[in-house]
Each structure stands twice: as structure tokens, then as C-alpha cells.
């Protein structure tokens, strides 16, 4: 299964469940750009020191690895595809700003915009 780092951080409990159940046919590939791309490129926890691979290891994943280069990916493909699961591979990627991406927004801005949409301008009185 493929997930982004932000999505994985929101569902860390699933790692513990897969590890405890020893889900042998499960491979989780985390595409880690260290940002919440879907909501405006806010920095994600993975970019602030949380290591998803180490979290997977701590929950009991027998195989968890981080890939940073194309050469490392080439070396890891067999392990990712055929390893005794559950397997987690964090693939670090860089993020180039896309012209269609939302502008960066912080939490307070998003909260205020949401309140205004629900309650109108009087939401800020």
C-alpha cells in the first residue's frame, strides 16, 4: 500500500496493529516529502525529527527501511516486494513547488477561514 508521510503520521496505530498481527502479505511504502502536500505544503512531523521507519521498528515490524537515493531504491526493491512482512519502506523525496499547489497556510489561518465559512463574519467578534 502507498501512503504519504502525513497520512501515515495520522494513522500510526495501524503500524502497531500490522506488527502485532504479523500481517505477512503487507508492504507499506511511505512517500515522505516531509510536508502535508494536500493542504498547502505545511511542514509535517517527518520533517521535524519523527522517523517513520524507526516508529515501524519500535512497533515490531520485522523489516523497515529508509530509502534516500535511486541507487538505494534499486538495492531495496526485492526486499520491499518480496520481504517477509509486514514490511515498511520510507522513500524520501524532494518536493518542488507545483504551480497548481495551494499556497502554504498555517493552522490558525485555516481555522479562521473555516469558522468564517461556517458562522460568517460574526465568528470573529
What are the functions of these language-model segments?
Residues 32-41, 57:
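Active-site pocket-lining segment
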Residues 43-79:
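Conserved thiamine diphosphate
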Residues 83-125:
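Glycine/aspartate-rich loop-and-adjacent alpha/beta segment that forms the canonical ThDP
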Residues 16-20, 44-45, 81-82, 105-109:
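Short, solvent-exposed amphipathic alpha-helical segments in soluble enzyme
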Residues 30, 68, 91-93:
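Short secondary-structure boundary segments
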Residues 1-34:
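Thiamine diphosphate
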Residues 28, 64-66, 88:
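Conserved beta-strand scaffold positions in the cores of enzyme catalytic domains, especially
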Residues 12-14, 38-42, 76-77, 99-102:
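Short, well-ordered secondary-structure micro-motifs
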Amino acid at each position: 500500500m502507498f501512503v504519504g508521510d502525513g497520512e501515515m503520521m495520522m494513522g500510526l496505530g495501524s503500524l502497531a496493529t500490522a506488527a502485532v498481527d504479523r500481517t505477512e502479505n503487507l508492504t507499506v511504502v511511505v512517500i515522505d516529502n516531509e510536508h502535508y502536500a494536500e493542504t498547502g505544503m505545511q511542514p509535517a512531523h517527518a520533517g521535524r525529527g519523527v522517523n517513520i521507519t524507526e516508529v515501524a521498528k519500535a512497533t515490531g515490524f520485522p523489516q523497515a527501511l529508509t530509502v534516500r537515493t535511486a541507487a538505494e531504491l534499486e538495492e531495496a526493491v526485492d526486499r520491499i516486494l518480496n520481504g517477509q512482512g509486514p514490511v515498511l519502506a520510507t522513500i524520501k523525496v524532494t518536493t518542488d513547488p507545483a504551480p497548481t499547489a495551494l499556497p502554504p497556510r498555517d493552522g490558525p489561518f485555516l481555522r479562521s477561514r473555516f469558522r468564517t465559512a461556517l458562522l460568517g463574519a460574526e465568528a470573529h467578534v
